[in-house]
Amino acid sequence: MSTRSVSSSSYRRMFGGPGTGSRPSSTRSYVTTSTRTYSLGSALRPSTSRSLYASSPGGAYATRSSAVRLRSSVPGVRLLQDSVDFSLADAINTEFKNTRTNEKVELQELNDRFANYIDKVRFLEQQNKILLAELEQLKGQGKSRLGDLYEEEMRELRRQVDQLTNDKARVEVERDNLAEDIMRLREKLQEEMLQREEAESTLQSFRQDVDNASLARLDLERKVESLQEEIAFLKKLHDEEIQELQAQIQDQHVQIDMDVSKPDLTAALRDVRQQYESVAAKNLQEAEEWYKSKFADLSEAANRNNDALRQAKQESNEYRRQVQSLTCEVDALKGTNESLERQMREMEENFAVEAANYQDTIGRLQDEIQNMKEEMARHLREYQDLLNVKMALDIEIATYRKLLEGEESRIALPLPNFSSLNLRETNLDSLPLVDTHSKRTLLIKTVETRDGQVINETSQHHDDLE
């Protein structure tokens, strides 16, 4: 029996061959040699050796060689002089031919795989050159045109943000100034309203005084009328009394004429009349003077109140006009303030939207830059992996070259002619017991490489009997 040990390689792992993956940082090589020796109990003993080579990373490509060794003699064995049966030689030739046919088929498969491998290596080298060119372009040019466009757009966005910030600050200053003007106008309006209230209260007091003066004038007019009526009544009464006195005087005069000895009453009546006339004139003069003084006082008070009322009306009209103008101005300022606040809100909303758009653009550009960096890092990792694979494939190519050279040298050896073999008969009874078990020698060689350098190499020998 023979054993073939096959390990998975990076080539099969990369290009679809069977096997499992290994670490990319280190490689291990295994060399397994299996040797079998068969004892046939005669002078002819075929020996078959199989060698398997596994290269990094864990790949295995096997070739096997078969040789037929003839031993003319065995120590302690006596050979017969007769010819051996050629059926054994025919069987050996058939096995040898089958082995050669299988080896040719395997060699053809290996050649096909090797050609595919070379094509893939060339393709990978072209891809590697493209990646190297891109990497050199990225490293050599520094900032690409896309980066310049991004930076230019970022500068433009920053300039717009600064301009909007300045506009916002200017609008806020204007708003503060307008707020101060509005506060000052409100204070002035409050003062004008207070003055208006004071003027209205003064006007109300003046109206009260005018009403009182009017009532006093009416009262005085009624008093004057009553006094005039009283004067007329007194005058009429006085006239009647005078007439009565005159009538009495006439009667008395007649009696006096008739009676001379009676006292003179005319003088007494005249004195009484003079006294009454003086009293009436005095009362009339005092009443007229009091009436004139009262009328003059009331006229002066009425004129004074009329002047104050007219002045109060003028001031009230002036205050009303001022209040109306201030109200219109306040309404205009309110409208201006509302429009400015609306514009400021719109500008703030636009600024917030533009700032959000700028932030989104900045985030998108940063994401694109990060993606480009990650893609560059991925290309670098792929490039490093390809370098590792290339080194491993170079090692496998060198191994294949050695195997092919060994196979070519083996094929070039002359084959023995089994038909001319003459074997002597061996007395098996007198021969010592020969071990019919096959001997297998297993050589395990472990080579660990990292970045193309051998860092560890171990060999193990195992001898087994079957």
UniProtKB/Swiss-Prot annotation:
Modified residues (N6-acetyllysine): 120, 129, 139, 168, 188, 223, 235, 294, 373, 445
Keywords tagged on the record: Acetylation, Cell membrane, Coiled coil, Cytoplasm, Cytoskeleton, Glycoprotein, Intermediate filament, Isopeptide bond, Membrane, Nucleus, Phosphoprotein, S-nitrosylation, Ubl conjugation
Domain notes from UniProt: The central alpha-helical coiled-coil IF rod domain mediates elementary homodimerization.
Residue(s) of cross-link: Glycyl lysine isopeptide (Lys-Gly) (interchain with G-Cter in SUMO1): 445
Annotated region (Disordered), positions in chain: 1-32
Ranges of Low complexity composition bias in the record: 1-13, 21-32
The family this protein is said to belong to: Belongs to the intermediate filament family.
Protein modification: Filament disassembly during mitosis is promoted by phosphorylation at Ser-55 as well as by nestin. One of the most prominent phosphoproteins in various cells of mesenchymal origin. Phosphorylation is enhanced during cell division, at which time vimentin filaments are significantly reorganized. Phosphorylation by PKN1 inhibits the formation of filaments. Phosphorylated at Ser-56 by CDK5 during neutrophil secretion in the cytoplasm. Phosphorylated by STK33. Phosphorylated on tyrosine residues by SRMS.
Annotated spans, Linker 1: 132-153
GO cellular component: cytoplasm; intermediate filament; nuclear matrix; plasma membrane
UniProt-listed Pfam families: Filament, Filament_head
Name recorded for this polypeptide: Vimentin
Residues modified as N-acetylserine: 2
Provenance organism: Canis lupus familiaris
Stretch list, region Coil 2: 269-407
Modification type Phosphothreonine: residues: 20, 426, 436, 446, 458
Segments traversing the membrane: none
Positions of modified residues (N6-succinyllysine): 120, 129, 188, 294, 445
Residue positions, PTM Phosphotyrosine: 53, 61, 117
Stretches for region Tail: 408-466
